[in-house]
């Protein structure tokens, strides 16, 4: 009974947040949700890493963050295949009431939102990396916007977004911890460099 009540609340929240905002908002959130839209942002982040720390750290950031994003995507796919749950656009009792944009309905299942997981993983990792308040606010604002776009388009329930967000934050934190350990191993501390030079 409790579980069914939670599912009903999830559906009610979805329908409340999925209202038709008109052609302008439809286009806006459709573009926001498209993965290719944010390629320039990812390129800008990598450029900022290179500008501040150089090629070596850029390579490690790209590798660790790439593994983090890949893990988020695969874990979400695992849940979609092994604990399948219909997307709102494919749920028989509410699909007729779900607002969709340009006929986009997504695949059948959407247990955990990969968009939310990936965006929040990137947000946490890069916020910890740059440690700038303005950047932290901006990148988490971007992640929230991207996550909400999935509800607006009707392809994820709020619960899917929350699960994806939790997964992304966990993976982002783990990836940054791994990155920190790697940097301690591969980068020689300045003090050690000075000692080596003075010994010659």
Question: What name fits each language-model region?
Answer:
Residues 41-52, 119-127:
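Hydrophobic, aromatic-rich transmembrane alpha-helices
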Residues 24-25, 54-60, 89, 131-137:
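Membrane-helix interface segments
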Residues 99-200:
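Membrane-embedded catalytic cores of phosphoryl/pyrophosphoryl-handling enzymes
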Residues 1-41, 76-107, 200:
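N-terminal transmembrane-helix/juxtamembrane module of multi-pass inner/ER membrane proteins
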Residues 46-75, 136:
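Interfacial segments of alpha-helical transmembrane regions
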Residues 45, 71-75, 79, 171-179:
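Alpha-helical membrane-inserting segments
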Residues 40-49, 66-67, 170-174:
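Hydrophobic core of alpha-helical transmembrane segments in multi-pass integral membrane proteins
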Residues 58, 66, 70-86, 162, ...:
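Membrane helix-loop-helix hairpins that form the core translocation module of multi-pass transporters
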């Amino acid at each position: 009974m409790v579980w069914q009540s939670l599912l009903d609340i999830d559906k009610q929240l979805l329908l409340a947040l999925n209202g038709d905002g008109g052609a302008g908002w439809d286009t806006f959130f459709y573009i926001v949700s498209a993965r290719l839209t944010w390629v320039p942002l990812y390129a800008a982040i990598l450029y900022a890493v290179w500008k501040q720390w150089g090629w070596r750290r850029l390579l490690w950031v790209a590798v660790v963050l790439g593994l983090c994003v890949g893990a988020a995507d695969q874990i979400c796919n695992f849940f979609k295949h092994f604990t399948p749950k219909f997307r709102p656009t494919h749920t028989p009792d509410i699909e007729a009431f779900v607002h969709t944009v340009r006929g986009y309905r997504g695949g059948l299942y959407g247990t955990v939102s990969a968009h939310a997981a990936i965006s929040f993983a990137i947000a946490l990792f890069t916020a910890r990396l740059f440690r700038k308040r303005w950047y932290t606010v901006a990148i988490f604002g971007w992640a929230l916007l991207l996550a909400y776009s999935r509800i607006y388009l009707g392809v994820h329930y709020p619960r899917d977004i929350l699960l994806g967000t939790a997964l992304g934050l966990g993976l982002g934190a783990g990836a940054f911890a791994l990155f920190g350990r790697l940097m301690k191993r591969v980068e020689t501390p300045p003090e050690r460099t000075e000692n080596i030079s003075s010994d010659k």
